[in-house]
């Protein structure tokens, strides 16, 4: 029987998380969540279990409320890179969860890299 989209999503999420656990060396994790209309990202310190920085397309100061396109994702990526610099973070792991590295997720990652984050 064919797997549903949800089953495939969960398999990808577990596979990505297990790869990140193998590489764990104290660097924070850049966790991405994408919905139908919005995208959000957090820098998470898994050792202490706390969020170090976050950005979302729902934030009014980014000026992208109501837009759910690739350009909005790029603005969120630039915002998280700027906030990571303020927090003193230069390197992290990119945790795409179960989302494919394409479109909005890729635009966010590219903008974060251009902003100075290394992953």
UniProtKB/Swiss-Prot annotation:
GO terms for biological process: translation. InterPro entries: Ribosomal_uL18_bac-type (IPR004389), Ribosomal_uL18_bac/euk (IPR005484). Keywords: Ribonucleoprotein, Ribosomal protein, RNA-binding, rRNA-binding. GO terms for cellular component: cytosolic large ribosomal subunit. GO terms for molecular function: 5S rRNA binding; structural constituent of ribosome. This is one of the proteins that bind and probably mediate the attachment of the 5S RNA into the large ribosomal subunit, where it forms part of the central protuberance. This is Large ribosomal subunit protein uL18. The lineage of its organism: Bacteria, Pseudomonadati, Pseudomonadota, Alphaproteobacteria, Rhodobacterales.
């Amino acid at each position: 029987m064919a797997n549903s989209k949800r089953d495939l999503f969960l398999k990808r999420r577990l596979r990505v998380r297990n790869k990140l656990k193998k590489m764990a060396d104290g660097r924070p994790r850049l966790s991405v969540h994408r919905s139908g209309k919005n995208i959000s990202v957090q820098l998470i310190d898994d050792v202490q279990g706390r969020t170090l920085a976050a950005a979302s397309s729902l934030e009014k100061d980014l000026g992208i409320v109501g837009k759910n396109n690739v350009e909005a994702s790029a603005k969120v990526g630039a915002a998280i890179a700027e906030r990571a610099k303020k927090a003193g973070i230069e390197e992290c792991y990119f945790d795409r969860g179960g989302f494919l590295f394409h479109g909005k997720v890729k635009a966010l990652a590219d903008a974060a890299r251009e902003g100075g984050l290394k992953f």
